[in-house]
Swiss-Prot record:
Name of this protein: CRISPR system Cascade subunit CasA
Pfam families in the record: CRISPR_Cse1
InterPro entries with a match to the protein in the record: CRISPR-assoc_prot_Cse1
Protein encoded by which gene: casA
Domain of life, source organism: Bacteria
Gene Ontology cellular component list: protein-containing complex
Molecular function GO terms recorded: DNA binding; RNA binding; zinc ion binding
Keyword Isomerase: no
Organism name: Escherichia coli (strain K12)
Length: 502
């Protein structure tokens, strides 16, 4: 199977209909409007990322004019064939010498089942997800390619002795969403000038993918020596698919396939990458420690909802107080090419504990027209939301722990943790809606209304949290102190001169 020629992309019509498996030419050369259709959101994100990376190497626009033209107009079949011709040999999943995302000649005592390529399907945290039984039993070529790419670039490594991708084990991936799959893919392909800016030393890098020019064992690799093709399709693990079985239904996408893969070989392999490779699909955090600049890609490290990270995802921040961030290059490109357009942002990834997946994350966040110019308003909305969360948590922490030096007994129950989860759940109905609809140039009234709603939410959650203990004689003083703490913090969150409740 060749990813540039054969049918492997699972889609359904944008307005509903049956799942179909199409090829890359059908995607690029037709006005049919498709959306990806896989049973798992992380596999859909991985499929999109794979399509974007393929698009980045075969079809980067030469300038903004060509970029806009390609969004609006499908390629002709001749144009498409010319674009893929130099790359065809690189994308055979079952190539005799250099199969896609694999290493030939892997030595392993046991065959690893395909479910190990599907993040979170097997292992101790499987119960945290809704997984169909047998989902990793036998995968078609398309789902196998998607899973290989996902494991290498967007999921944690296999554990001890195996490396994760260039962005770390659980990077946050961000993409601009278009009206359909074709436009979404093309919106996230950097133009040639932006690609050259992202990778200024490209002519001095190694740019063959790892399955054609393998990484050497124990090699020390400067990140700056990795070309954009090699980096986008980085494979840190030694994996080799076993021979496929015959025709049948793919256990992942559910479609009939002539060949299905049931297992693979893997072996431990180590090397070191020095520095940060400038991946165009992820926001980057910058910190200064002891005068040294440290960079790392944004990751989901807590269960806090995606809105808490928005200011890091769409607003560049120069280093202040030893912290800063850069948004993903694909988001910055859209900001510059479409300065008056609203933004639909796909944001996804995993939260993990070492090699175990704790949570899959996949959100679409909407930003009204004006988001490009009003990063300060976006920052304020996020800061307001986090401020009220902190006020509630501090007050309930006081109630839970008490004050030993003042002889106030605590409830001894982590009500602050439970209330924080409820706050986040409720805030996901409020804050994303504000960002999607706010008139950024006249945001004061909307932010004031948000403050009022969050104030009321804090009061409600505080009262719900303490209600079971309200009549406990030894907690009456502690409750009064905790309530006073809540209103103290809520008053501090009011703008100067604003009214206060309590």
């Amino acid at each position: 199977m060749n990813l540039l020629i054969d049918n492997w992309i699972p889609v359904r019509p944008r307005n509903g209909g049956k799942v179909q498996i199409i090829n890359l030419q059908s995607l690029y050369c037709s006005r049919d409007q498709w959306r990806l259709s896989l049973p798992r959101d992380d596999m859909e994100l991985a499929a999109l990322a794979l399509l974007v990376c393929i698009g980045q190497i075969i079809a980067p626009a030469k300038d903004d004019v060509e970029f806009r033209h390609r969004i609006m107009n499908p390629l002709t079949e001749d144009e498409f064939q010319q674009l893929i011709a130099p790359w065809i040999d690189m994308f055979y999943l079952n190539h005799a010498e250099h199969p896609f995302m694999q290493t030939k000649g892997v030595k392993a005592n046991d065959v690893t089942p395909m479910e190990k390529l599907l993040a979170g399907v097997s292992g101790a945290t499987n119960c945290a997800f809704v997984n169909q039984p047998g989902q990793g039993e036998a995968l078609c070529g398309g789902c196998t390619a998607i899973a290989l790419f996902n494991q290498a670039n967007q999921a944690p490594g296999f554990g001890g002795g195996f490396k994760s991708g260039l962005r770390g084990g659980t990077p946050v991936t961000t993409f601009v969403r278009g009206i359909d799959l074709r436009s979404t893919v093309l919106l996230n392909v950097l133009t040639l000038p932006r690609l050259q800016k992202q990778f200024p030393n490209e002519s001095h890098t190694e740019n063959q993918p790892t399955w054609i020019k393998p990484i050497k064992s124990n090699e020390s690799i400067p990140a700056s020596s990795i070309g954009f093709v090699r980096g986008l399709f980085w494979q840190p693990a030694h994996i080799e698919l076993c021979d496929p079985i015959g025709i049948g239904k793919c256990s992942c996408c559910g479609q009939e396939s002539n060949l299905r893969y049931t297992g693979f070989l893997k072996e431990k392999f180590t090397f070191t990458v020095n520095g940060l490779w400038p991946h165009p699909h992820s926001p980057c955090l910058v910190t200064v420690k002891k005068g040294e600049v440290e960079e790392k890609f944004l990751a989901f490290t807590t269960s806090a909802p995606s809105w808490t990270q928005i200011s890091r995802v769409v607003v560049d921040k120069i280093i202040q107080n030893e912290n800063g961030n850069r948004v993903a290059a694909v988001v910055n490109q859209f900001r510059n090419i479409a300065p008056q357009s609203p933004l639909e942002l796909i944001m996804g990834g995993y939260r993990n504990n070492q090699a175990s997946i704790l949570e899959r994350r996949h959100d679409v966040l909407m930003f009204n027209q004006g988001w490009q110019q009003y990063g300060n308003v976006i920052n304020e909305i996020v800061t307001v939301g986090l401020g009220y969360k902190t006020a509630l948590r501090k007050a309930l922490y006081t109630f839970a722990e008490g004050f030993k030096n003042k002889d106030f007994k605590g409830a001894g129950v982590s009500v602050h943790e439970t209330a924080e989860r409820h706050f986040y759940r409720q805030s996901e109905l409020l804050i994303p809606d504000v960002l999607a609809n706010v008139n950024f140039s006249q945001a004061d009234e909307v932010i004031a209304d948000l403050r009022d709603k969050l104030h009321q939410l804090c009061e409600m959650l505080f009262n719900q949290s303490v209600a079971p203990y309200a009549h406990h004689p030894k907690l009456i003083s502690t409750l009064a102190l905790a309530r006073a703490t809540l209103y103290k913090h809520l008053r501090e969150l009011k703008p100067q001169g604003g009214p206060s409740n309590g």
